[in-house]
Amino acid sequence: EWEEDAWSTAETFDRDGKPELLVVDHYAIDQRWERTFRQAGITVMAIDDLADRTHDCDVLLDQNYYTDLETRYGKLVPFDALRLLGPRYALLREEFLSEPGVARSRGEAVGRILVFFGGVDSSNATSKAIAALVAMRRPDIEVDVVIGGGNPNRDRIEALCAQQPRFRFHCQTSRMASLMARADLAIGAGGTTTWERAFMGLPSLVMSVAENQVRAAKDVHD
């Protein structure tokens, strides 16, 4: 299967031109696929956070924090590969770099909460968070609820927000950095958003909603 995908990718390059850099971000791809393109003279950059397979790459990027960050990839990458490890290499969208409210100081009072559990949120943690916040009966707190366009519970979540005068519903927003800058607290999942919240200096209640989020969340907590 990997061979078929590699050949298909190679055909694309033959047709459209060979790239100088090939960025690979897929849990099912390992050294076999990557070697095909390194041998063709293409620089390969692998993005990973599982450290569960061998890579044949020139550059490895893992933006997450782990207590064994410097050693967890061991012999999984070539000895001369450039290793970009840790949150200092977090992949942030341009909106975060240009947001004027980056890492603003926040007081102890919580007046605005941001809820975001990723683009799909297959466990529907968003609805559970909304229910918990409504049960608090705090009319002094404003809540921004963000979901991705692929959320299967969109209509239900939008309806729940519409029932609460201080809740605002956002779908597939390009204003995430602005919403984080305005918030006093975030409630959400781990993953990439962890480093976006950290960059914005936003205190967070984090729940792991996928297996690959558990280890990083525990290590950051510790």
What are these regions (language model features)?
Residues 47-48, 63, 86-87, 146, ...:
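Generic beta-sheet signal
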Residues 5-8, 32, 153-156, 174-178, ...:
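Short acidic active-site motifs
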Residues 56-124, 150, 155:
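A nucleotide-sugar donor-handling region in carbohydrate enzymes
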Residues 16-21, 165, 183-185:
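Short acidic/histidine-rich motifs immediately flanking catalytic phosphotransfer sites
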Residues 194-222:
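Catalytic binding pocket for nucleotide-activated donors in carbohydrate/polymer assembly enzymes
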Residues 100-101, 107-183:
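Donor-nucleotide binding loops and adjacent catalytic segments primarily
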Residues 1-79:
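Active-site and donor-binding regions of nucleotide-sugar-utilizing enzymes
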Residues 181-192:
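Acidic donor-binding loop of glycosyltransferase active sites
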